[in-house]
C-alpha cells in the first residue's frame, strides 16, 4: 500500500492525476497532460478511450455512475492481472459494427460492455443489463459481472437478453466454428463470497 500511495502522490504532483471528491466518494481522473502523453506515445491503444464523444470523457457526478466506473476499473485490473487482453490493439475486433470474420479467438480477451454495445442497433435490448463486459477464451464465452462490496441487483430479463445476444452474435454469426450453444456462461466478481449466499 505504501508504494501505491507514493506512486499516486507522484502522479498528482506531476499534474498527471487529479483527485475528485463528491458525495464522500473519492476517485482519480487523468489530467490533460496525462491524456496527451498517452495519446502521443500510444495512439492506437488509447485513442478509442480518450478521443471523441466517449463515456470516459464525460464527467460522472452521480454516485451510481461513479460506482459503476469503479466496478469496471476493478474488472479491468482483475483481467489484466490474469493476463487477459484488454486493449483494442491486442485483441480481435469481434464486436466491430461492420462484423467479424478473422477467425477464432486464440487468447483470452475482455470486451467491456461499451465495446459490445458498439455493434449498434441489436444492443439496445441490453441497455439495462448489469454486465461489465464479456470474457472470450478459446473454449468459452463468459458474461462478466462485478458486484464489488454490494449484493447484485439482478434484472433477470435483461441478463437473459445479454445471454441471448452473445449466443446469437458469437455462436451463430461471428464465431460459429468456435462456440456452441452451451458456450455462454457467466463470471461474477465481488469483494467476498459472503454476498453469494
Tell what function each PLM region has.
Residues 19, 29, 87-90, 187-189:
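A structural signal for short, well-ordered beta-strand segments and their strand-loop junctions
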Residues 53-150:
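Exposed, interaction-prone assembly regions rather than primary DNA-binding/catalytic cores
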Amino acid at each position: 500500500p505504501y508504494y501505491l500511495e507514493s506512486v499516486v502522490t507522484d502522479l498528482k504532483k506531476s499534474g498527471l492525476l487529479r483527485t475528485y471528491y463528491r458525495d464522500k466518494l473519492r476517485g482519480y481522473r487523468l489530467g490533460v497532460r496525462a491524456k496527451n502523453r498517452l495519446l502521443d506515445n500510444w495512439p492506437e491503444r488509447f485513442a478509442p478511450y480518450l478521443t471523441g464523444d466517449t463515456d470516459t470523457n464525460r464527467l460522472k457526478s452521480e454516485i451510481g455512475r461513479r460506482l459503476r466506473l469503479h466496478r469496471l476499473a476493478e474488472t479491468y485490473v482483475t483481467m489484466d492481472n490474469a493476463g487477459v487482453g484488454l486493449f483494442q490493439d491486442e485483441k480481435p475486433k469481434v464486436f466491430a459494427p461492420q462484423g467479424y470474420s478473422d477467425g477464432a479467438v486464440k487468447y483470452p480477451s475482455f470486451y467491456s460492455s461499451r465495446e459490445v454495445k458498439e455493434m449498434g442497433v441489436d444492443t439496445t435490448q441490453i441497455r439495462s443489463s448489469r454486465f461489465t463486459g464479456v470474457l472470450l477464451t478459446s473454449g468459452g464465452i463468459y458474461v462478466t459481472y462485478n458486484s464489488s462490496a454490494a449484493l447484485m441487483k439482478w434484472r433477470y430479463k435483461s441478463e437473459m437478453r445479454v445471454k441471448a445476444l452473445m449466443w446469437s452474435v458469437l455462436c451463430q454469426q461471428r464465431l460459429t466454428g468456435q462456440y456452441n450453444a452451451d458456450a455462454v456462461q457467466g463470471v461474477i466478481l465481488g469483494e467476498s463470497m459472503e454476498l453469494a449466499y
